[in-house]
Amino acid sequence: MEYAPGRSIDLYGAPSDPTVLLWHGTQTDARHTVRALATLLADRGLSVAVPDWDSHSDDRGRSDLLASVDYARSWSQNPDGLVLAGWSLGGVAAAGLTVDAADHGLVLAHTVCLAGAFMVLDPISGTDVTDRLGGSRAASPFTLLHGSADDVVPVAASRSFSHSLAAAGWDVRLLELDADHGNIAGARYVESADRYEPADDPDTKRVAGVVAGHIATAAGVTQAG
């Protein structure tokens, strides 16, 4: 399935279910890395759209990310109930789009950031999300999930961003999990390939299950998966 010419997207569940748009991180066209998490979300009664996007393109992935939002909204039967979730750099993009949602004519139900790399620039706007909070209008709530064992993006990044969101009037919840940078998204880092891949080891399954539960709660789905 393509959300734009040459740009692939995986769809899980039924569009009548609450919809989560899930963005992977910096790794180019890496929708497969969050496959396990997307499957767990679908098992919990959610529909999930997972696009490829290219953070190394000339526009930092902006056109990919915005086109995927349009596609997910057109696919979902409740486009204004969209939950936006992103991992690492994808989490920064999700936060940036949420802060600027009104400028894009968007209504989001909730935003979930997994190990958000908030110390780097938002790939959509090319600016620091935190610097834009002062002029933003608080809207949809945030859930920030970060692993205490993350040695790629320190948990301090989410702590600081959570504080900034709250100071600007946004509804935010920060949860620090027993997780690392990969398994919080159902993935693991393969050193020999210098890339993340989906993982199915018991610890990753446990962490991804916890994360899926929090995303489901953000989407208003509370039954066990």
Feature-to-residue mapping (PLM):
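N-terminal cap/lid segment of alpha/beta-hydrolase-fold proteins
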Residues: M1-P15
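Short beta-strand element of the alpha/beta-hydrolase
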Residues: D17-G25
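The serine-hydrolase catalytic nucleophile loop
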Residues: Q27-A38, W53, A156
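Conserved alpha/beta-hydrolase
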Residues: A42-S57
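Alpha/beta-hydrolase active-site loop
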Residues: S57-S76
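Primarily recognizes the serine-hydrolase "nucleophile elbow" in alpha/beta-hydrolase
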Residues: D70-R132
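The feature captures the conserved acid-bearing segment of alpha/beta-hydrolase catalytic domains
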Residues: A115-A168
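C-terminal catalytic histidine-bearing segment of alpha/beta-hydrolase fold enzymes
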Residues: A168-G225
